[in-house]
A protein has these predicted regions:
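Loop-to-helix entry and N-terminal half of a specific, functionally important transmembrane alpha helix
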Residues: 431-470, 476
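Hydrophobic alpha-helical segments of polytopic membrane proteins
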Residues: 278-297, 301-341
Length: 505
Protein backbone atom coordinates (compact mmCIF):
# COMPACT_ATOMS: atom_id res chain seq x y z
CA UNK A 1 0.00 0.00 0.00
CA UNK A 2 1.17 3.52 -0.80
CA UNK A 3 0.28 6.34 1.64
CA UNK A 4 -1.19 9.63 0.39
CA UNK A 5 0.07 12.31 2.77
CA UNK A 6 -0.69 15.72 1.26
CA UNK A 7 -3.53 17.79 -0.14
CA UNK A 8 -1.93 17.56 -3.60
CA UNK A 9 0.18 14.52 -4.53
CA UNK A 10 2.19 13.92 -7.68
CA UNK A 11 2.15 10.33 -8.98
CA UNK A 12 4.80 9.05 -11.38
CA UNK A 13 7.99 7.12 -11.99
CA UNK A 14 10.24 9.94 -10.76
CA UNK A 15 11.83 9.49 -7.34
CA UNK A 16 10.79 13.06 -6.52
CA UNK A 17 7.09 12.16 -6.92
CA UNK A 18 4.97 12.05 -3.76
CA UNK A 19 3.76 8.60 -4.83
CA UNK A 20 6.49 6.76 -6.76
CA UNK A 21 5.43 3.94 -9.09
CA UNK A 22 8.19 1.61 -10.29
CA UNK A 23 6.77 0.92 -13.74
CA UNK A 24 8.57 1.84 -17.03
CA UNK A 25 5.19 2.39 -18.74
CA UNK A 26 4.40 5.21 -16.28
CA UNK A 27 5.60 8.74 -17.10
CA UNK A 28 8.01 10.47 -14.73
CA UNK A 29 5.24 12.90 -13.73
CA UNK A 30 2.10 11.06 -14.76
CA UNK A 31 -0.83 12.54 -12.84
CA UNK A 32 -1.87 14.37 -9.69
CA UNK A 33 -4.20 13.21 -6.92
CA UNK A 34 -5.61 16.22 -5.09
CA UNK A 35 -8.06 16.92 -2.31
CA UNK A 36 -10.64 19.70 -2.30
CA UNK A 37 -13.56 20.56 0.00
CA UNK A 38 -15.94 18.28 -1.88
CA UNK A 39 -13.64 15.27 -2.19
CA UNK A 40 -10.66 13.80 -4.04
CA UNK A 41 -9.80 14.28 -7.72
CA UNK A 42 -7.27 12.86 -10.19
CA UNK A 43 -5.87 14.90 -13.08
CA UNK A 44 -3.52 13.80 -15.85
CA UNK A 45 -0.43 15.99 -16.41
CA UNK A 46 0.26 15.48 -20.13
CA UNK A 47 1.45 11.90 -19.65
CA UNK A 48 2.21 9.72 -22.68
CA UNK A 49 -0.35 6.98 -22.00
CA UNK A 50 -2.97 9.06 -20.19
CA UNK A 51 -4.80 8.35 -16.93
CA UNK A 52 -7.80 6.01 -16.65
CA UNK A 53 -10.44 6.10 -13.90
CA UNK A 54 -12.55 2.94 -13.66
CA UNK A 55 -11.59 2.08 -17.24
CA UNK A 56 -12.45 5.51 -18.72
CA UNK A 57 -9.83 8.02 -19.88
CA UNK A 58 -9.92 11.20 -17.80
CA UNK A 59 -10.34 14.70 -19.22
CA UNK A 60 -9.35 17.40 -16.77
CA UNK A 61 -10.15 16.64 -13.15
CA UNK A 62 -12.11 13.49 -12.39
CA UNK A 63 -13.65 12.80 -8.98
CA UNK A 64 -12.28 9.76 -7.13
CA UNK A 65 -14.32 7.73 -4.64
CA UNK A 66 -13.31 4.95 -2.25
CA UNK A 67 -12.52 1.70 -4.13
CA UNK A 68 -12.27 3.50 -7.50
CA UNK A 69 -9.44 2.25 -9.73
CA UNK A 70 -6.89 4.66 -11.21
CA UNK A 71 -4.88 3.13 -14.06
CA UNK A 72 -1.58 4.69 -15.15
CA UNK A 73 0.50 2.81 -17.71
CA UNK A 74 0.46 -0.83 -16.67
CA UNK A 75 -0.27 -0.08 -13.00
CA UNK A 76 -3.66 0.07 -11.29
CA UNK A 77 -4.15 1.97 -8.01
CA UNK A 78 -7.24 1.49 -5.84
CA UNK A 79 -8.33 4.21 -3.41
CA UNK A 80 -8.67 3.07 0.22
CA UNK A 81 -9.45 4.81 3.50
CA UNK A 82 -6.52 6.09 5.54
CA UNK A 83 -7.30 3.88 8.54
CA UNK A 84 -6.68 0.80 6.39
CA UNK A 85 -2.99 1.74 6.10
CA UNK A 86 -1.29 -0.13 8.96
CA UNK A 87 2.41 0.42 8.21
CA UNK A 88 4.26 3.02 10.33
CA UNK A 89 5.19 6.26 8.58
CA UNK A 90 8.89 7.03 8.61
CA UNK A 91 9.76 10.14 10.57
CA UNK A 92 11.07 13.02 8.51
CA UNK A 93 12.04 16.65 8.95
CA UNK A 94 8.48 17.58 8.05
CA UNK A 95 6.75 15.59 10.77
CA UNK A 96 9.27 15.15 13.59
CA UNK A 97 9.58 18.88 14.18
CA UNK A 98 5.87 19.54 14.72
CA UNK A 99 5.28 20.40 18.38
CA UNK A 100 2.07 20.51 20.39
CA UNK A 101 3.59 23.00 22.84
CA UNK A 102 1.36 26.12 22.92
CA UNK A 103 2.88 29.32 21.55
CA UNK A 104 3.02 32.58 23.47
CA UNK A 105 -0.32 34.35 23.66
CA UNK A 106 -0.67 36.82 20.80
CA UNK A 107 -1.56 39.76 23.05
CA UNK A 108 1.55 39.13 25.16
CA UNK A 109 3.68 39.14 22.02
CA UNK A 110 2.08 42.42 20.96
CA UNK A 111 2.83 43.93 24.37
CA UNK A 112 6.52 43.03 24.03
CA UNK A 113 6.65 44.62 20.58
CA UNK A 114 4.90 47.76 21.84
CA UNK A 115 7.31 48.06 24.79
CA UNK A 116 10.30 47.79 22.45
CA UNK A 117 8.93 50.53 20.19
CA UNK A 118 8.21 52.66 23.28
CA UNK A 119 11.83 52.33 24.43
CA UNK A 120 12.87 53.53 20.97
CA UNK A 121 10.51 56.48 21.43
CA UNK A 122 12.05 57.39 24.80
CA UNK A 123 15.55 57.13 23.36
CA UNK A 124 14.61 59.40 20.45
CA UNK A 125 13.09 61.98 22.84
CA UNK A 126 16.45 62.48 24.59
CA UNK A 127 18.66 62.93 21.54
CA UNK A 128 21.65 65.26 21.52
CA UNK A 129 19.93 68.07 19.63
CA UNK A 130 17.37 68.49 22.41
CA UNK A 131 14.71 70.03 20.15
CA UNK A 132 11.14 68.88 19.44
CA UNK A 133 11.33 66.29 22.20
CA UNK A 134 7.64 65.33 22.02
CA UNK A 135 7.62 64.40 18.31
CA UNK A 136 8.69 60.77 18.93
CA UNK A 137 5.91 60.32 21.52
CA UNK A 138 3.24 61.52 19.09
CA UNK A 139 4.60 59.21 16.38
CA UNK A 140 4.69 56.29 18.82
CA UNK A 141 1.04 56.90 19.70
CA UNK A 142 0.08 56.76 16.02
CA UNK A 143 2.21 53.64 15.49
CA UNK A 144 0.68 51.86 18.50
CA UNK A 145 -2.82 52.74 17.26
CA UNK A 146 -2.11 51.21 13.84
CA UNK A 147 -0.48 48.08 15.32
CA UNK A 148 -3.15 47.37 17.90
CA UNK A 149 -5.92 48.27 15.46
CA UNK A 150 -4.56 45.67 13.05
CA UNK A 151 -4.29 43.15 15.90
CA UNK A 152 -7.90 43.64 17.05
CA UNK A 153 -9.24 43.40 13.50
CA UNK A 154 -7.30 40.18 12.87
CA UNK A 155 -8.10 38.64 16.24
CA UNK A 156 -11.68 39.70 16.93
CA UNK A 157 -13.18 40.66 13.54
CA UNK A 158 -11.54 38.17 11.16
CA UNK A 159 -11.09 35.82 14.18
CA UNK A 160 -7.74 34.33 13.25
CA UNK A 161 -6.22 31.98 15.81
CA UNK A 162 -2.55 32.86 15.30
CA UNK A 163 -0.67 36.13 14.97
CA UNK A 164 3.01 35.12 15.05
CA UNK A 165 3.84 36.07 11.46
CA UNK A 166 2.08 39.43 11.65
CA UNK A 167 3.90 40.14 14.92
CA UNK A 168 7.28 39.69 13.23
CA UNK A 169 6.23 42.04 10.43
CA UNK A 170 4.91 44.64 12.92
CA UNK A 171 8.14 44.45 14.94
CA UNK A 172 10.23 45.23 11.86
CA UNK A 173 7.80 47.83 10.53
CA UNK A 174 7.72 49.74 13.81
CA UNK A 175 11.51 49.91 14.00
CA UNK A 176 11.65 51.31 10.47
CA UNK A 177 9.06 53.97 11.33
CA UNK A 178 10.67 55.04 14.62
CA UNK A 179 14.15 55.24 13.06
CA UNK A 180 12.88 57.96 10.70
CA UNK A 181 11.65 60.39 13.36
CA UNK A 182 15.05 62.08 13.78
CA UNK A 183 15.77 62.17 10.06
CA UNK A 184 12.49 63.38 8.60
CA UNK A 185 9.31 63.60 10.63
CA UNK A 186 7.21 63.77 7.46
CA UNK A 187 8.88 60.64 6.07
CA UNK A 188 8.10 58.79 9.30
CA UNK A 189 4.37 59.49 8.96
CA UNK A 190 4.41 58.67 5.23
CA UNK A 191 6.04 55.34 6.11
CA UNK A 192 3.40 54.65 8.76
CA UNK A 193 0.53 55.43 6.38
CA UNK A 194 2.11 53.24 3.69
CA UNK A 195 2.45 50.41 6.23
CA UNK A 196 -1.24 50.74 7.12
CA UNK A 197 -2.13 50.52 3.42
CA UNK A 198 0.15 47.49 3.18
CA UNK A 199 -1.80 45.81 5.98
CA UNK A 200 -4.98 46.36 3.96
CA UNK A 201 -3.24 44.78 0.94
CA UNK A 202 -2.30 41.88 3.22
CA UNK A 203 -5.94 41.19 4.08
CA UNK A 204 -7.15 41.64 0.48
CA UNK A 205 -4.55 39.25 -0.97
CA UNK A 206 -5.34 36.57 1.62
CA UNK A 207 -9.02 36.78 0.67
CA UNK A 208 -8.21 36.87 -3.06
CA UNK A 209 -6.19 33.64 -3.01
CA UNK A 210 -8.53 31.72 -0.69
CA UNK A 211 -9.52 29.33 -3.51
CA UNK A 212 -6.37 28.02 -5.28
CA UNK A 213 -8.44 26.83 -8.26
CA UNK A 214 -9.98 30.24 -8.95
CA UNK A 215 -6.54 31.84 -8.66
CA UNK A 216 -5.48 30.20 -11.95
CA UNK A 217 -8.07 32.28 -13.81
CA UNK A 218 -6.32 35.47 -12.71
CA UNK A 219 -2.91 34.52 -14.12
CA UNK A 220 -3.26 36.21 -17.52
CA UNK A 221 -4.63 39.55 -16.18
CA UNK A 222 -1.88 39.52 -13.53
CA UNK A 223 0.82 38.94 -16.16
CA UNK A 224 -0.49 41.84 -18.25
CA UNK A 225 -0.59 44.06 -15.16
CA UNK A 226 3.02 43.26 -14.16
CA UNK A 227 4.43 43.79 -17.66
CA UNK A 228 2.35 46.96 -17.95
CA UNK A 229 3.73 48.35 -14.68
CA UNK A 230 7.32 47.74 -15.74
CA UNK A 231 6.67 49.00 -19.28
CA UNK A 232 5.15 52.25 -18.01
CA UNK A 233 8.20 52.73 -15.79
CA UNK A 234 10.54 52.47 -18.79
CA UNK A 235 8.53 55.14 -20.65
CA UNK A 236 7.74 57.55 -17.82
CA UNK A 237 10.25 56.63 -15.11
CA UNK A 238 12.65 59.24 -13.79
CA UNK A 239 16.32 58.28 -13.81
CA UNK A 240 17.73 58.24 -10.27
CA UNK A 241 21.23 56.88 -9.56
CA UNK A 242 21.40 55.39 -13.05
CA UNK A 243 18.03 53.58 -12.89
CA UNK A 244 14.68 54.76 -14.27
CA UNK A 245 12.65 52.95 -11.62
CA UNK A 246 10.59 55.76 -10.06
CA UNK A 247 7.43 57.40 -11.39
CA UNK A 248 6.57 60.89 -10.14
CA UNK A 249 3.07 62.38 -10.17
CA UNK A 250 3.41 65.83 -8.65
CA UNK A 251 4.85 65.41 -5.15
CA UNK A 252 3.81 61.75 -5.10
CA UNK A 253 6.26 59.07 -6.21
CA UNK A 254 6.15 55.28 -6.30
CA UNK A 255 8.21 52.34 -7.53
CA UNK A 256 6.15 49.97 -9.75
CA UNK A 257 8.78 47.23 -9.60
CA UNK A 258 7.99 46.75 -5.89
CA UNK A 259 4.36 45.97 -6.66
CA UNK A 260 5.47 43.75 -9.56
CA UNK A 261 7.22 41.51 -6.99
CA UNK A 262 3.83 40.47 -5.61
CA UNK A 263 2.56 39.55 -9.07
CA UNK A 264 5.80 37.71 -9.87
CA UNK A 265 5.29 35.40 -6.87
CA UNK A 266 1.60 35.02 -7.74
CA UNK A 267 2.37 33.90 -11.31
CA UNK A 268 5.11 31.49 -10.24
CA UNK A 269 2.79 29.33 -8.14
CA UNK A 270 -0.14 27.14 -9.20
CA UNK A 271 -2.04 24.10 -8.03
CA UNK A 272 -0.05 20.93 -8.71
CA UNK A 273 -2.11 19.60 -11.62
CA UNK A 274 -1.74 22.91 -13.50
CA UNK A 275 1.85 23.38 -12.39
CA UNK A 276 3.15 20.19 -13.95
CA UNK A 277 1.94 20.91 -17.49
CA UNK A 278 4.45 22.07 -20.11
CA UNK A 279 2.25 25.02 -21.10
CA UNK A 280 2.30 26.44 -17.58
CA UNK A 281 6.07 26.10 -17.30
CA UNK A 282 6.68 27.76 -20.67
CA UNK A 283 4.39 30.67 -19.74
CA UNK A 284 6.29 31.25 -16.51
CA UNK A 285 9.72 31.13 -18.18
CA UNK A 286 8.66 33.67 -20.82
CA UNK A 287 7.03 35.92 -18.21
CA UNK A 288 10.15 35.81 -16.00
CA UNK A 289 12.45 36.61 -18.93
CA UNK A 290 10.30 39.59 -19.92
CA UNK A 291 10.23 40.97 -16.34
CA UNK A 292 13.99 40.60 -15.80
CA UNK A 293 14.65 42.07 -19.25
CA UNK A 294 12.47 45.12 -18.57
CA UNK A 295 14.18 45.70 -15.22
CA UNK A 296 17.58 45.50 -16.94
CA UNK A 297 16.43 48.02 -19.58
CA UNK A 298 15.42 50.51 -16.89
CA UNK A 299 18.78 49.96 -15.15
CA UNK A 300 17.36 48.49 -11.92
CA UNK A 301 19.82 45.61 -11.72
CA UNK A 302 19.37 45.07 -7.98
CA UNK A 303 15.67 44.29 -8.41
CA UNK A 304 16.44 42.29 -11.58
CA UNK A 305 18.79 40.12 -9.52
CA UNK A 306 16.09 39.60 -6.87
CA UNK A 307 13.60 38.56 -9.56
CA UNK A 308 16.12 36.18 -11.13
CA UNK A 309 17.06 34.44 -7.88
CA UNK A 310 13.37 34.15 -7.01
CA UNK A 311 12.82 32.60 -10.45
CA UNK A 312 15.54 30.03 -9.72
CA UNK A 313 13.93 29.15 -6.39
CA UNK A 314 10.49 28.89 -7.98
CA UNK A 315 11.79 26.81 -10.91
CA UNK A 316 13.49 24.38 -8.55
CA UNK A 317 10.41 24.02 -6.35
CA UNK A 318 8.25 23.45 -9.41
CA UNK A 319 10.45 20.83 -11.07
CA UNK A 320 13.16 19.71 -8.62
CA UNK A 321 15.41 19.61 -11.69
CA UNK A 322 18.94 21.00 -11.32
CA UNK A 323 19.38 21.00 -15.11
CA UNK A 324 16.81 23.77 -15.41
CA UNK A 325 18.69 25.81 -12.82
CA UNK A 326 22.04 25.30 -14.55
CA UNK A 327 20.64 26.42 -17.91
CA UNK A 328 19.07 29.51 -16.33
CA UNK A 329 22.32 30.45 -14.57
CA UNK A 330 24.27 30.00 -17.82
CA UNK A 331 21.84 32.32 -19.60
CA UNK A 332 22.17 34.83 -16.74
CA UNK A 333 25.98 34.83 -16.99
CA UNK A 334 25.68 35.64 -20.69
CA UNK A 335 23.23 38.44 -19.86
CA UNK A 336 25.49 39.90 -17.17
CA UNK A 337 28.43 39.94 -19.60
CA UNK A 338 26.27 41.80 -22.11
CA UNK A 339 25.13 44.32 -19.49
CA UNK A 340 28.66 45.04 -18.23
CA UNK A 341 29.73 45.81 -21.80
CA UNK A 342 26.96 48.30 -22.56
CA UNK A 343 26.32 49.69 -19.05
CA UNK A 344 29.74 50.91 -17.87
CA UNK A 345 28.45 52.43 -14.61
CA UNK A 346 27.47 48.92 -13.48
CA UNK A 347 31.01 47.71 -14.15
CA UNK A 348 32.29 50.68 -12.11
CA UNK A 349 30.43 49.35 -9.06
CA UNK A 350 32.28 46.07 -9.40
CA UNK A 351 35.60 47.91 -9.69
CA UNK A 352 34.99 49.55 -6.30
CA UNK A 353 33.82 46.34 -4.65
CA UNK A 354 36.21 45.12 -1.92
CA UNK A 355 38.30 48.29 -2.45
CA UNK A 356 36.13 50.89 -0.70
CA UNK A 357 39.00 52.23 1.41
CA UNK A 358 40.70 53.26 -1.80
CA UNK A 359 37.58 55.20 -2.84
CA UNK A 360 36.46 56.91 0.37
CA UNK A 361 35.95 60.25 -1.40
CA UNK A 362 34.19 59.11 -4.57
CA UNK A 363 30.97 57.28 -5.45
CA UNK A 364 32.64 53.87 -5.57
CA UNK A 365 33.29 53.60 -1.84
CA UNK A 366 32.05 56.71 -0.02
CA UNK A 367 28.84 55.14 1.35
CA UNK A 368 30.27 51.73 2.27
CA UNK A 369 33.30 53.25 4.00
CA UNK A 370 31.02 55.42 6.16
CA UNK A 371 28.80 52.45 6.99
CA UNK A 372 31.75 50.39 8.23
CA UNK A 373 33.19 53.32 10.20
CA UNK A 374 29.96 54.33 11.93
CA UNK A 375 28.93 50.73 12.63
CA UNK A 376 32.17 50.34 14.57
CA UNK A 377 31.49 53.55 16.52
CA UNK A 378 28.00 52.31 17.44
CA UNK A 379 29.33 49.18 19.10
CA UNK A 380 26.98 46.64 20.65
CA UNK A 381 24.37 49.05 22.01
CA UNK A 382 24.52 52.10 19.72
CA UNK A 383 24.84 55.84 20.26
CA UNK A 384 21.10 56.51 20.46
CA UNK A 385 18.42 57.32 17.88
CA UNK A 386 19.23 60.61 16.18
CA UNK A 387 22.77 60.79 17.56
CA UNK A 388 24.52 59.03 14.68
CA UNK A 389 26.47 60.52 11.78
CA UNK A 390 25.46 58.06 9.06
CA UNK A 391 22.09 59.83 8.75
CA UNK A 392 23.98 62.62 6.95
CA UNK A 393 24.98 60.20 4.16
CA UNK A 394 22.65 59.79 1.17
CA UNK A 395 20.28 56.79 1.28
CA UNK A 396 21.11 56.08 4.94
CA UNK A 397 17.42 55.46 5.67
CA UNK A 398 16.97 53.00 2.80
CA UNK A 399 19.94 51.31 1.11
CA UNK A 400 22.22 51.77 4.14
CA UNK A 401 19.65 51.30 6.90
CA UNK A 402 21.46 48.27 8.34
CA UNK A 403 24.44 50.51 9.04
CA UNK A 404 22.17 53.22 10.48
CA UNK A 405 20.51 50.76 12.89
CA UNK A 406 23.93 49.37 13.87
CA UNK A 407 25.27 52.84 14.67
CA UNK A 408 22.26 54.23 16.53
CA UNK A 409 20.82 51.08 18.17
CA UNK A 410 23.81 48.76 18.19
CA UNK A 411 24.97 45.69 16.32
CA UNK A 412 22.86 43.43 18.57
CA UNK A 413 19.60 45.04 17.42
CA UNK A 414 20.74 45.13 13.79
CA UNK A 415 21.58 41.43 13.92
CA UNK A 416 18.21 40.73 15.56
CA UNK A 417 16.43 42.40 12.64
CA UNK A 418 18.26 40.15 10.19
CA UNK A 419 17.34 37.09 12.28
CA UNK A 420 13.68 38.21 12.31
CA UNK A 421 13.60 38.25 8.50
CA UNK A 422 15.31 34.86 8.44
CA UNK A 423 12.68 33.57 10.88
CA UNK A 424 10.02 34.26 8.25
CA UNK A 425 11.77 31.83 5.92
CA UNK A 426 11.95 29.19 8.68
CA UNK A 427 8.26 29.76 9.43
CA UNK A 428 7.37 29.37 5.74
CA UNK A 429 9.47 26.22 5.44
CA UNK A 430 7.78 24.68 8.46
CA UNK A 431 4.15 25.33 7.49
CA UNK A 432 4.23 24.56 3.76
CA UNK A 433 4.19 20.78 4.24
CA UNK A 434 0.65 21.10 5.62
CA UNK A 435 -0.61 23.62 3.03
CA UNK A 436 -3.87 22.96 1.19
CA UNK A 437 -2.27 23.41 -2.22
CA UNK A 438 1.09 23.55 -3.96
CA UNK A 439 0.12 27.12 -4.87
CA UNK A 440 0.45 28.10 -1.21
CA UNK A 441 3.63 26.07 -0.64
CA UNK A 442 5.51 27.56 -3.58
CA UNK A 443 4.29 31.13 -3.13
CA UNK A 444 5.12 31.10 0.60
CA UNK A 445 8.63 29.69 0.20
CA UNK A 446 9.39 32.00 -2.72
CA UNK A 447 8.07 35.09 -0.92
CA UNK A 448 10.18 34.23 2.13
CA UNK A 449 13.14 33.42 -0.12
CA UNK A 450 12.74 36.80 -1.81
CA UNK A 451 12.96 38.47 1.61
CA UNK A 452 16.18 36.60 2.42
CA UNK A 453 17.76 37.46 -0.96
CA UNK A 454 16.77 41.11 -0.56
CA UNK A 455 18.08 41.16 3.02
CA UNK A 456 21.40 39.64 1.93
CA UNK A 457 21.89 42.14 -0.89
CA UNK A 458 21.09 45.05 1.43
CA UNK A 459 23.24 43.99 4.40
CA UNK A 460 26.21 42.60 2.48
CA UNK A 461 26.09 45.39 -0.09
CA UNK A 462 26.25 48.10 2.57
CA UNK A 463 29.14 46.33 4.33
CA UNK A 464 31.11 45.68 1.10
CA UNK A 465 30.78 41.89 1.24
CA UNK A 466 28.82 42.17 -2.04
CA UNK A 467 28.60 45.04 -4.55
CA UNK A 468 26.16 47.76 -3.45
CA UNK A 469 22.96 47.17 -5.45
CA UNK A 470 20.62 49.72 -3.87
CA UNK A 471 17.90 47.32 -2.67
CA UNK A 472 15.94 47.83 0.53
CA UNK A 473 15.93 46.02 3.87
CA UNK A 474 12.50 44.32 4.11
CA UNK A 475 10.05 46.30 6.30
CA UNK A 476 12.78 48.52 7.81
CA UNK A 477 14.05 50.66 4.91
CA UNK A 478 12.18 53.88 4.18
CA UNK A 479 9.93 53.76 1.13
CA UNK A 480 6.17 53.51 0.81
CA UNK A 481 6.25 51.20 -2.22
CA UNK A 482 8.70 48.90 -0.46
CA UNK A 483 6.72 48.55 2.77
CA UNK A 484 3.46 47.92 0.90
CA UNK A 485 5.17 45.27 -1.22
CA UNK A 486 6.56 43.57 1.89
CA UNK A 487 3.14 43.33 3.52
CA UNK A 488 1.69 42.01 0.27
CA UNK A 489 4.34 39.28 0.13
CA UNK A 490 3.74 38.29 3.76
CA UNK A 491 0.17 37.46 2.75
CA UNK A 492 1.47 34.52 0.69
CA UNK A 493 3.26 33.11 3.73
CA UNK A 494 0.19 33.60 5.90
CA UNK A 495 -2.05 31.88 3.34
CA UNK A 496 0.17 28.78 3.39
CA UNK A 497 -0.71 28.16 7.03
CA UNK A 498 -3.75 25.86 6.93
CA UNK A 499 -5.11 27.54 10.08
CA UNK A 500 -5.62 30.80 8.15
CA UNK A 501 -8.67 29.45 6.30
CA UNK A 502 -9.76 26.36 8.23
CA UNK A 503 -9.71 27.51 11.86
CA UNK A 504 -11.46 30.52 13.41
CA UNK A 505 -11.75 31.71 16.99
Amino acid sequence: MLPVLFWENSIGRSKSSDVTVDDPTVSRNHCVLLRRKDGWYVSDTDSKSGTMLNGKRTRGRAKVLIDDTITIGGTSLIGKRGEEFQQPLHSSWFFSKVSDKPAMKSWKLMLLITFFHFFMCVQAMFWNDGTNTMAPLVLFGALAAVEWGFFFISYFVIRRVNFELESLALFLTGIGVMMLIRQSERSAYVQLVAAAIGMIFFCIIIKLIEDPDKVNKLRLPAMICAVGLLGVTIVFGKITNGAANWIYIGSFSFQPSELAKIIFIFIGASSLDVLMTKKNLLEYIIFSAVCVGLLALMGDFGTALIFFVTFLLTAFMRSGDFKTIILAVAAAIFGVTFVLKFKPYVADRFSGWRHVWEHTQDNLGYQQARVLTYMASGGLFGVGIGNGFLKQVAASESDLVFGLVSEEMGVIVAFTLAVAVGAMFIYARAITTRSRSTFYSISACCAAGLFVVQLSLNVFGATDVLPLTGVTFPFVSAGGSSIMSCWGLVAFIKAADERTYSVKR
